[in-house]
């Protein structure tokens, strides 16, 4: 029978799982006896002085190689077998092996021979061994030493051995208690509100006095979704306290374990257990571990505190909606309010797991492994599994795979779930519900697969070197886990279970609320781009909280294993320490806040890792993450990593195993010393890359020296391995600041130092190539491309050139974090096309500019009747400011404002999340963006409804100023609300151009319907004598380009906007004010002084008045947008031009009001940043109130109100 379902066969048979309780004991005793016999043979035949690698070490290795796999199988039953008898027998076998190893590795006679072989190598009296063999002997020697062979006095060695056996038995008993744990809590039906029905349906119904209750086990698959979703705080507290009070019998056992570890370490001559355990690991000393923990805790703490405050605010709001109050966040609240955070998470949290059915997800994960690492997984065929169920697998639910090499020879790599076993804790599928995973569980699954891969692919000479040091073991798996912080990989693996087969589809339909709907709309097969982006980004708080958890556990681990003294440890209350440390790290309280005291729970009793091989080593999870991020950043950051990258990683990391020092493995693969930079960037703790308290204030600048600067940027503050390249660049720039300080008497140099700090922090967030510094080609090009000289003259600290939504998100998060420390350097501008003229509209002095218009090749595309405007070159695609301000075009009479044609916005919010807003998803934000300027975030993509447009009749007709009255008559008649031709568009301008020395009338005419000859709507305009006409029929593109040519940039310019009622008297008055105004500035060099009239009939403003925020729904009749547009050459004329323009606007407003022809609405696209041009308030009280409400929802801290001075701001009150 071909159990492997493949034409290739393994060189040896896989292990069998056919043991009985008695056979386990017999096999274990036989293995132990064989080892003792082998060692006795060595000692009896080889004198100490004659010991060599060949006659002493090789026999030990041969015995280990044979015994290692058999021993693992015999002890495997203790945690996996469905039979309690087998579990108990396997636990007893574990005690036998533990005691036997203590006896073996405390044998002084064998230690003397091993020591002799090592000394021969050290003294080079024999031929040198290869590096792997020498490394093996060194580890073997340390193992003997740590098992008491370094203790000189025989009586102490016996004491040590006895205590080590007792220690092993205690650990096994604690584990047995944990494995047999059946704890839980009874929940009444009134306590289940919010808990998913899919979970409730799996809970056991009580009987007797609990007949109306359900039993919720404290095991993670049950308790985690319950505490995350239960609406009642009392319910959440009951569940959490039940979890924290499991295994009371382990409290004294754990205390004895800690005391014995300390005592045995001191017997070996170590200061404490932590010093013993770190001595042969990568970190080498407890002090190095403490420095790592302190560094990470310091980096994460500010954002963690912010996170807690945000969750507390959600809790307060929820309490207020229920008519109660809430003043504090507790541990049992963290998961629940984290899940309630943010619109994106709220919408997807309940259904995201539907895209990750266990078996389908596993298959997709394995396919990623196959692609990356050149392997093939073959599921053992069903017939083979059934026949082998009693021997090849230990439970009928086990899935078995064979693993083969693809690149090169068809090399067999072992049986995936026999030689290596993946044991996960999932709720079993039922006939009505499959096993569905959360995204965190998908990450965890890929993480654990990583451990299997390490086991499968490691190739060493000796079984003992197959495993790496405990503080490196997590890094390779955490690297794989990181794939699912990248949106493309999340999307690739996602697959809604209703698409798997018809049975699964029926299961899904049965979960729908509307059971009467026989044909509900199908779920998309994969998660959308927007959702996966936000899944990746919205998990920052989870990442922060996750790292806090690791800091807490690692800190507690070091506190109990590195006491100040033996007496201090004996006096230590381990339960109180556990709860106090957790509260101190999280800045959140638990039962102690409600009168329970510091012993309200004993969570240390279920701290499996500290019991099992992670004692004084839990920091490995943090160190592993640091390493993992550096590995991922080095080799797998591309969206589609190549097989070459995967094979390189497999060969240089996985294959090496523990045959050399793990730090060498890391540096060989990375090509550099490990860095915390990718880790901090992953957490988005950008402000902590260069802490703000390093930056000197003005008072410090006077005496600053280069040495002082270097001290401010010390490697200790720059993280464990430092960000030295950034440090060096900052040092050079700050040294230059110091030179300017000496030359300029210190003026503004403190500010300049802050700017350097901010720029490099941004570079750490989005990448150095995407942050242009002053003096660079990219920086200069960005400034030159502004439409107005006033904008171009501003000098930002840097220009961010994002290449993706992810870059924009990172930049926003970074700037928001910098803001926590205050300072002008944290303010920023957002630029789309850069056409607004007033200084600061989309540029900023001493801040950062996020420039969307000079970023990446255009991604505009048309699908069906929609067109997307996204990443693209300025002028070609970027219409962000135009659209957010309302926008008018020559098709507006048919379709409304430009913003009315939008079907969806994609926007980066203040918290960095990227969300879509349309009529169904976030409809309030969707409406607010239609006129609400840049108060809510950075719009990175706009999807427009499109229509087919043929050739356009268009052109400009110029006439002398003597025809002004006729022009006004024609304009008013054209703009009549009762006879407006929606295919016609007119802009009438009264223009003084110094180059021509006289005023003229210009009518820009456009007609968007195919006509023969002059359109009837324009007959009046064309009947007026003209001095030049450019009318013709041309394509839409040609017409647009011709219009753009009339508005070239590179000049000083300003605009004002006023809205008038469309009557001859009002417009005539405006014209007369203009005609008496321009003479005051007619001698200004290159002045162009224009009053532009643009029709605003009900056909435009009423068409979608209730779905935008422009506030014109209550208007009736034709209006006019009057724009004062001025350009000139010299800065020396700024004051004269500005005062003349402002006076003219005031005169026009006063005249219109006197005639009853003034409308308060101000068109944002033509407005000025002037106290009299309060654009948002001009929309009216109802719109202002609505915009304030939406701002509070999406930007409660006012990031885009306070940090972005450009645009038109929503009032504070």
UniProtKB/Swiss-Prot annotation:
Its cofactor is Zn(2+). GO terms for molecular function: flavin adenine dinucleotide binding; metal ion binding; metalloendopeptidase activity. The keyword Transmembrane does not apply. InterPro entries: FAD-bd_PCMH-like_sf, FAD-bd_PCMH_sub2, MetalloPept_cat_dom_sf, Neurolysin/TOP_dom2, Neurolysin/TOP_N, Pept_M3A_M3B, Pept_M3A_M3B_dom. Pathway: Mycotoxin biosynthesis. GO terms for biological process: peptide metabolic process; proteolysis. Its EC number is 3.4.24.-. GO terms for cellular component: mitochondrial intermembrane space. Binds 1 zinc ion per subunit. Zn(2+) binds at residues 447, 451, 454. It is an enzyme of class 3 (hydrolase). Keywords: Hydrolase, Metal-binding, Metalloprotease, Protease, Virulence, Zinc. The active site is at residue 448. SUPFAM superfamilies: FAD-binding/transporter-associated domain-like, Metalloproteases ('zincins'), catalytic domain. It comes from the Eukaryota. The keyword Zinc applies. Oligopeptidase; part of the gene cluster that mediates the biosynthesis of the phomopsins, a group of hexapeptide mycotoxins which infects lupins and causes lupinosis disease in livestock. Within the pathway, phomG and phomG' are probably involved in the processing of the phomA and phomA' precursors. The pathway starts with the processing of the precursor phomA by several endopeptidases including kexin proteases as well as the cluster-specific S41 family peptidase phomP1 and the oligopeptidase phomG to produce 10 identical copies of the hexapeptide Tyr-Val-Ile-Pro-Ile-Asp. Belongs to the peptidase M3 family. Monomer. This is Oligopeptidase PhomG'. It comes from Diaporthe leptostromiformis (Lupinosis disease fungus). The gene is PhomG'.
């Amino acid at each position: 029978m071909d159990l492997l379902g493949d034409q290739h066969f393994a060189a040896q048979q896989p292990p069998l799982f056919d043991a009985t309780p008695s056979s386990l004991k017999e096999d274990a005793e036989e293995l132990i006896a064989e080892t003792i016999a082998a060692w006795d043979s060595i000692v009896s035949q080889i004198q100490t002085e004659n010991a060599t690698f060949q006659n002493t070490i090789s026999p030990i290795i041969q015995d280990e190689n044979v015994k290692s796999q058999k021993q693992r199988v015999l002890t495997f039953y203790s945690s996996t077998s469905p039979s309690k008898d087998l579990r108990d027998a396997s636990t007893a076998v574990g005690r036998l092996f533990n005691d036997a190893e203590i006896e073996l590795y405390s044998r002084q006679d064998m230690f003397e021979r091993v020591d002799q072989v090592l000394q021969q190598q050290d003294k080079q009296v024999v031929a040198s061994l290869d590096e792997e063999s020498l490394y093996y002997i060194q580890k073997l020697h340390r193992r003997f030493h740590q098992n008491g062979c370094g203790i000189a006095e025989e009586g102490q060695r016996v004491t040590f051995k006895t205590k080590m056996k007792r220690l092993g038995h205690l650990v096994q008993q604690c584990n047995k208690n944990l494995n047999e744990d059946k704890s839980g809590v009874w929940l009444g039906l009134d306590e289940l509100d919010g808990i998913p029905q899919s979970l409730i349906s799996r809970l056991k119904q009580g009987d007797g006095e609990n007949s109306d209750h359900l039993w919720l086990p404290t095991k993670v698959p049950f308790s985690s979704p319950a505490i995350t979703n239960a609406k009642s705080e009392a319910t959440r507290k009951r569940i959490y306290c039940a979890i924290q009070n499991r295994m009371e019998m382990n409290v004294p056992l754990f205390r004895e374990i800690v005391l014995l570890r300390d005592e045995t370490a001191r017997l070996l001559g170590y200061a404490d257990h932590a010093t013993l355990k770190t001595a042969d690991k990568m970190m080498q000393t407890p002090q190095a571990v403490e420095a790592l923990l302190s560094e990470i805790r310091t980096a994460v703490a500010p954002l963690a505190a912010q996170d807690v405050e945000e969750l507390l605010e959600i809790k307060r709001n929820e309490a207020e909606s229920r008519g109660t109050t809430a003043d504090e966040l507790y541990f049992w609240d963290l998961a629940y309010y984290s899940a309630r955070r943010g619109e994106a998470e709220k919408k997807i949290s309940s259904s995201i797991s539907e895209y990750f059915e266990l078996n389908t997800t596993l298959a997709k994960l394995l396919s990623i492994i196959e692609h990356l690492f050149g392997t093939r997984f073959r599921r053992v065929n069903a017939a083979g599994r059934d026949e082998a169920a009693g021997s090849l697998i230990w439970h009928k639910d086990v899935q078995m795979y064979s693993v083969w090499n693809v690149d090169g020879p068809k090399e067999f790599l072992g049986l995936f779930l026999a030689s290596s076993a993946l044991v996960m804790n999932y709720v079993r599928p039922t006939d009505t519900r499959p096993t569905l995973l959360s995204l965190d569980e998908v990450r965890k699954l890929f993480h654990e697969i990583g451990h299997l891969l390490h086991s499968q692919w490691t190739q060493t000479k000796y079984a003992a070197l197959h495993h790496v040091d405990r503080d490196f073991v997590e890094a390779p798996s955490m690297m794989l886990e990181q794939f699912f912080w990248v949106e493309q990989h999340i999307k690739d693996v996602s697959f809604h279970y209703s698409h798997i087969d018809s049975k699964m589809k029926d299961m899904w339909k049965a979960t729908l609320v509307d059971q009467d709907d026989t044909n509900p709309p199908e779920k998309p097969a994969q998660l959308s781009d927007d959702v996966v982006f936000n899944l990746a980004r919205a998990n920052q708080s989870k990442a922060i909280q996750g790292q806090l958890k690791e800091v807490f556990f690692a800190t507690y681990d070091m506190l109990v294993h590195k006491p100040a003294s033996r007496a201090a440890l004996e006096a230590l209350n381990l339960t109180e320490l556990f709860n106090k440390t957790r509260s101190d790290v999280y800045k959140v309280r638990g039962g102690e806040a409600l009168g329970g005291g510091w012993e309200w729970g004993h969570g240390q009793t279920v701290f499996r890792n500290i019991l099992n091989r992670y004692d004084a080593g839990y920091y490995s999870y943090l160190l592993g993450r640091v390493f993992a991020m550096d590995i991922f950043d080095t080799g797998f950051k591309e969206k589609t990593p190549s097989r070459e990258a995967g094979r390189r990683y497999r060969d240089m990391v996985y294959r090496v195993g523990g045959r050399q020092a793990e730090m060498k493995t890391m540096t060989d693969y990375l090509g550099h010393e490990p860095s915390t930079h990718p880790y901090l960037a992953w957490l988005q703790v950008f402000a902590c890359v260069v802490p703000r308290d390093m930056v000197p204030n003005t008072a410090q600048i006077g005496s600053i020296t280069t040495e002082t600067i270097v001290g401010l940027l010390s490697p200790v503050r720059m993280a464990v391995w430092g960000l030295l390249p950034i440090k060096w660049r900052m040092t050079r720039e700050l040294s230059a600041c110091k030179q300017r300080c000496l030359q300029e008497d210190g003026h503004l140099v403190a500010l300049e130092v802050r700017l350097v700090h901010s720029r490099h922090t941004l570079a750490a967030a989005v990448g150095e190539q995407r942050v242009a510094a002053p003096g660079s080609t990219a920086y200069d090009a960005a400034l030159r491309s502004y439409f107005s000289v006033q904008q171009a003259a501003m000098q930002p600290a840097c220009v961010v050139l994002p290449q993706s939504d992810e870059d924009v998100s990172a930049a926003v998060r970074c700037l928001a974090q910098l803001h926590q420390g205050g300072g002008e350097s944290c303010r920023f501008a957002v630029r789309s096309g850069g056409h607004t003229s007033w200084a600061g509209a989309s540029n900023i002095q001493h801040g950062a500019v996020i420039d969307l218009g000079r970023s990446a090749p255009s991604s505009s595309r048309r699908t069906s009747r929609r067109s997307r405007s996204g990443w693209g070159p300025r002028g070609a695609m970027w219409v962000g400011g135009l659209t957010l301000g309302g926008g008018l075009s020559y098709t507006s009479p048919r379709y409304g404002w430009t913003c009315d044609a939008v079907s969806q916005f994609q926007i980066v919010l203040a918290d960095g999340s990227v969300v879509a807003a349309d009529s169904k998803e976030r409809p309030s934000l969707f409406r607010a963006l239609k006129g609400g300027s840049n108060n809510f975030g950075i719009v990175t993509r706009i999807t427009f409804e499109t229509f087919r447009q043929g050739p356009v009749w268009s052109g400009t007709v110029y006439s002398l100023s003597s025809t002004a009255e006729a022009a006004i008559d024609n304009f008013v008649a054209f703009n009549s609300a009762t006879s407006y031709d929606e295919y016609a568009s007119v802009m009438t301008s009264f223009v003084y151009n110094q180059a021509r020395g006289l005023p003229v009338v210009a009518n820009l005419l456009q007609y968007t319907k195919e006509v023969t000859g002059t359109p009837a709507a324009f007959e009046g305009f064309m009947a007026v004598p003209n001095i030049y006409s450019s009318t013709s029929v041309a394509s839409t593109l040609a017409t647009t380009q011709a219009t753009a040519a009339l508005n070239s940039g590179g000049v000083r310019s300003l605009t004002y906007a006023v809205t008038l009622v469309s009557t001859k008297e009002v417009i005539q008055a405006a014209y007369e004010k203009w005609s008496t105004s321009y003479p005051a500035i007619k001698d200004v060099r290159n002045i162009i002084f224009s009053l532009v009239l643009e029709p605003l009939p009900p056909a435009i403003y009423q068409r979608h008045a209730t779905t935008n925020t422009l506030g014109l729904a209550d208007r009736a009749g034709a209006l006019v947008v009057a724009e004062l547009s001025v350009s000139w050459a010299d800065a020396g004329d700024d004051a004269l031009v500005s005062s003349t323009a402002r006076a003219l606007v005031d005169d026009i407003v006063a005249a219109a009001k006197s005639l009853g022809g003034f409308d308060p609405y101000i068109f944002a696209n033509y407005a000025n940043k002037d106290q009299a041009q309060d654009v948002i308030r001009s929309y009216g009280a109802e719109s202002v109130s609505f915009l304030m409400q939406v701002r509070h929802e999406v930007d409660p801290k006012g990031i885009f109100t306070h940090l972005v001075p450009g645009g038109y701001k929503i009032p504070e009150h």
